[in-house]
């Protein structure tokens, strides 16, 4: 039920007692609404019950195990959110002068330095407002670099067939042609195909390491050498950075540019459509093209760098500083954990993944790459379950919901049939992993004896199986558009 359906003329919630906020900030009359918003007329109790019930029907990191592969659904520490909400941060106006924002600017400057140290890249811009926008910025910098050298014939970006879908999207948005590179049977890139396809038209290659197959790319140094010798650059998709924190740096692997997903690796709020942040880090040759603004330190303090400092910049990607509140959360997360803590993040994430993979194979599941060690995530292929029991990976995923577990990523990467991509982040305990194994064992037994239970799942949730095509083609997003 929608809250609008609870509405009845005359009902209202009592005004909340205002918090003590120091100064009283009022909105000038010329900016105030001329008519009241079309809000539902409900009592405070109705509103509280409605949204509390909705929250109890949702899966979340706070309430459920959430092994969504390639998403790193880790716990967001509450203390980090509290620190980012200090009055000095949240009451600062985006147009405040530099001399009125020294604490804020110093924090962002330190965050730039932390990211530089983590990635092994000297240049950092914090402004992109999502991982996808950071990815676009990275490819745009590759294009600007080649154009500045008069190397305009480079119109191709090489992308593995196991890549995230945003990779080809970013390349196309920047005007490049996408050239797909196949994956070899062992899960690594097919080097022979790469050698055939790299050449004078290659602007760069986009890679995730570890890949979306949950495997570390063992020939990365050779790949970097091949692409660089051909005049191209290497782009690092930071989606799986959680697996290598403190162990190896993208810059040391030969990458020239990357973006970071703060909502994955650095525990900022995840999902809900934002706000987000996707900082970019670059090697020395791409520093002139970084998006603005960036924070600079001089003898007189901290300042925003301008177009005069970076005349070849690809420009702005957002108003002001991007989503500063998200950047602050990532900064405090790094500050709380420290260097040793971030190292343990990757160690525990990798340990959890390999332990879970081993335990699931013990109860009958098949690893997509049984001869390879997992990084932070791994893939099960349910081909035999489909053949023997006529149940699909989607059926398994839907049945997991009945057991209070959010489903893993299904049918991605596309090259692995009937796959589940499973990622148990470092914040999950052994007890939680063992409980998940027990559930997976039970579901597999159900598939062999009562497959219809899986085919008709979920049975305990208000929303069953949606018509994805209908939902995408017939949008129903506005209550008043369909009820007036």
UniProtKB/Swiss-Prot annotation:
It comes from the Bacteria. GO terms for cellular component: cytosol; glycine cleavage complex. It catalyses: N(6)-[(R)-lipoyl]-L-lysyl-[glycine-cleavage complex H protein] + glycine + H(+) = N(6)-[(R)-S(8)-aminomethyldihydrolipoyl]-L-lysyl-[glycine-cleavage complex H protein] + CO2. It is an enzyme of class 1 (oxidoreductase). Its cofactor is pyridoxal 5'-phosphate. Its EC number is 1.4.4.2. One of its GO terms (molecular function) is pyridoxal phosphate binding. Keywords: Oxidoreductase, Pyridoxal phosphate. Pfam families: Aminotran_5, GcvP2_C. The modification N6-(pyridoxal phosphate)lysine is found at residue 264. One of its GO terms (biological process) is glycine decarboxylation via glycine cleavage system. The glycine cleavage system catalyzes the degradation of glycine. The P protein binds the alpha-amino group of glycine through its pyridoxal phosphate cofactor; CO(2) is released and the remaining methylamine moiety is then transferred to the lipoamide cofactor of the H protein. HAMAP family: GcvPB. NCBIfam families: PRK04366.1. The glycine cleavage system is composed of four proteins: P, T, L and H. In this organism, the P 'protein' is a heterodimer of two subunits. Belongs to the GcvP family. C-terminal subunit subfamily. This is Probable glycine dehydrogenase (decarboxylating) subunit 2. It comes from Legionella pneumophila (strain Corby).
């Amino acid at each position: 039920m929608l809250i609008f359906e609870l509405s009845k003329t005359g009902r209202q919630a009592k005004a909340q007692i205002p918090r003590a906020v120091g100064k009283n900030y009022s909105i000038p009359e010329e900016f105030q609404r001329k008519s009241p918003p079309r809000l539902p007329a409900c009592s405070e109790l109705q509103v509280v019950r409605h949204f509390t019930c909705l929250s109890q029907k949702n899966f979340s990191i706070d309430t459920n195990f959430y092994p969504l592969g390639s998403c790193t659904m880790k716990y967001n520490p509450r203390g980090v959110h509290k620190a980012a909400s200090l009055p000095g941060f949240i009451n600062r106006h985006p147009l405040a002068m530099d001399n009125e924002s020294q604490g804020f600017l110093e924090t962002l400057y330190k965050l730039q330095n932390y990211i530089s140290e983590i990635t092994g890249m000297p240049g950092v811009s914090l402004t992109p407002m999502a991982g996808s926008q950071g990815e676009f910025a990275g490819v745009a910098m590759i294009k600007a670099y080649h154009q500045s050298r008069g190397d305009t014939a480079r119109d191709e970006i090489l992308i593995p067939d196991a890549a995230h879908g945003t990779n080809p999207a970013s390349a196309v948005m920047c005007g490049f042609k996408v050239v797909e590179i196949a994956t070899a049977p062992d899960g690594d890139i097919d080097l022979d195909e790469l050698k055939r396809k790299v050449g004078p038209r290659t602007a760069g290659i986009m890679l995730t390491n570890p890949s979306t197959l949950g495997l570390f790319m063992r020939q990365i140094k050779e790949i970097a050498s091949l692409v660089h010798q051909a005049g191209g650059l290497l782009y690092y998709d930071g989606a799986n950075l959680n697996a290598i924190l403190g162990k190896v740096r993208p810059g040391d692997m030969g990458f020239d540019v990357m973006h970071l997903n703060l909502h994955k690796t650095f525990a900022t709020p995840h999902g809900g459509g934002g706000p987000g942040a996707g900082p970019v880090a670059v090697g020395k040759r791409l520093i002139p093209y970084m998006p603005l603004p960036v924070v600079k330190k001089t003898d007189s303090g901290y300042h925003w760098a301008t177009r005069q400092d970076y005349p070849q910049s690809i420009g702005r990607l957002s108003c002001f500083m991007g989503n500063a509140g998200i950047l602050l959360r990532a900064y405090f997360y790094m500050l709380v954990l420290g260097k040793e803590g971030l190292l343990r993040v990757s160690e525990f994430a990798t340990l959890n993944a390999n332990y879970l993979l081993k335990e699931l194979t013990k109860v009958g599941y098949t690893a997509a790459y049984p001869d390879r060690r997992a990084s932070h995530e791994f893939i099960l292929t349910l081909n035999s379950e489909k053949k023997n029991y006529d149940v699909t990976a989607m059926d398994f995923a839907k049945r997991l919901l009945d057991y209070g577990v959010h489903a893993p990523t299904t049918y991605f990467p596309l090259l692995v049939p009937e796959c589940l991509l499973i990622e148990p982040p470092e914040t999950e305990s052994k007890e939680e992993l063992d409980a998940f194994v027990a559930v997976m064992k039970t579901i597999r037994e159900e598939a062999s004896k009562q497959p219809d239970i899986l085919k008709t799942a979920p049975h305990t949730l208000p929303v069953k199986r949606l018509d994805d095509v209908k939902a995408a083609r017939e949008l129903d997003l506005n209550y008043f558009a369909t009820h007036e």
